Amino acid sequence: MIAASIKAEVVKDNARAANDTGSPEVQVALLTARINELTPHFKTHAKDHHGRRGLLRMVSRRRKLLDYLKSKDADRYTALIAKLGLRK
């Protein structure tokens, strides 16, 4: 789990309004933070298959949110992936 202070910072950086916690941008940013925190764990614990399943679930959920955002507003989608560095 990510620390509350890091989570609050991620929400503040990606929120569209003052108390925005549910927009796709915030959800994708939080999932990205959790994924980035878990990724090094699997470099040292390669046989943690149950944990890997959770990671793949998060990646899949992030992909679905990004697909939704792309279909609704392509400009916000491109800005978000550039900000988070998700695509090359």
Swiss-Prot record:
One GO CC annotation, please? Answer: cytosolic small ribosomal subunit
Gene3D superfamilies documented for this protein:
6.10.250.3130, S15/NS1, RNA-binding (1.10.287.10)
What is the documented function of this protein?
One of the primary rRNA binding proteins, it binds directly to 16S rRNA where it helps nucleate assembly of the platform of the 30S subunit by binding and bridging several RNA helices of the 16S rRNA. Forms an intersubunit bridge (bridge B4) with the 23S rRNA of the 50S subunit in the ribosome.
List the Gene Ontology MF annotations in alphabetical order: rRNA binding; structural constituent of ribosome
UniProt keyword annotations, A-Z = Ribonucleoprotein, Ribosomal protein, RNA-binding, rRNA-binding
Query: What's the protein name?
Result: Small ribosomal subunit protein uS15
Under the heading Pfam families, the entry gives:
Ribosomal_S15
Q: Which PANTHER family match?
A: RIBOSOMAL PROTEIN S15, BACTERIAL AND ORGANELLAR, SMALL RIBOSOMAL SUBUNIT PROTEIN US15M
InterPro entries listed in its UniProt record:
Ribosomal_uS15 (IPR000589), Ribosomal_uS15_bac-type (IPR005290), uS15_NS1_RNA-bd_sf (IPR009068)
Q: Record's HAMAP family?
A: Ribosomal_uS15_B
Q: How does it assemble?
A: Part of the 30S ribosomal subunit. Forms a bridge to the 50S subunit in the 70S ribosome, contacting the 23S rRNA.
Mind listing the GO biological process terms from this record?
translation
Provide the family line. Answer: Belongs to the universal ribosomal protein uS15 family.
State the taxonomy lineage: Bacteria, Pseudomonadati, Pseudomonadota, Betaproteobacteria, Burkholderiales
